[in-house]
A protein has these predicted regions:
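Surface-exposed peri-terminal alpha-helical interaction modules
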Residues: 2-185
Length: 185
């Protein structure tokens, strides 16, 4: 299924970037909401995120992904502009999977929470090894936001979306432990 999604994502992206009017009309008529079902149990509008990802504005999409996760977590998270690790478990699985699929489809399977989680599992759940593998840290030095991150497809697998590590690993650990992934394992 993932290989099919990657191929579909690549095809859609190539058509999306083609300036030909007939192709754009075809996309509008047949795929007005893109190729990823924008499922949300809380009626979150993922179309702006989908557009940024289709345009491969990965930095803008990263910021918007956090905003959407804050919306899912509630008013307090929206106001403080970040999420407590304890709020992650209550994020709806359908929404987390939608966010992940949007990233997967727009990056040829290179980016997304599920990609990061697979890498984390492959390194024995060792966050230190994960940070190096996805280029969030080099030796003892954290990658500086935003200038040192790679905001295009030349980034290593799992590089995006970002998760703020200033408060430790608890947020990303909670994302990786979320029940949404048990449906995909």
């Amino acid at each position: 299924e993932q290989a099919e999604n990657v191929a579909l994502g690549k095809a859609y992206h190539a058509l999306y970037l083609n300036p030909n009017l007939k192709i754009q009309e075809f996309l509008q008529q047949n795929f007005p909401l893109g190729v990823v079902p924008l499922e949300s149990t809380q009626e979150i509008d993922y179309r702006p995120l989908q557009q940024l990802l289709a345009q491969q504005d990965f930095q803008g999409a990263d910021v918007l992904t956090l905003q959407k996760m804050c919306e899912l977590a509630g008013t307090a998270a929206v106001e403080r502009k970040w999420i407590y690790f304890t709020e992650i478990v209550n994020l709806p699985s359908a929404d987390l999977i939608t966010l992940d699929r949007l990233w997967l489809m727009s990056s040829a399977g290179k980016f997304g929470f599920s990609v990061q989680r697979r890498i984390w599992l492959s390194v024995g759940k060792d966050f230190t090894k994960l940070w190096t593998k996805i280029n969030w840290k080099s030796g003892n030095v954290w990658t500086r936001y935003p200038q040192e991150f790679t905001w295009d497809l030349s980034a290593p697998k799992g590089h995006l979306p970002l998760s703020n590590q200033l408060r430790g690993v608890r947020v990303i650990d909670a994302i990786f432990a979320h029940p949404a992934w048990s449906k995909q394992d």
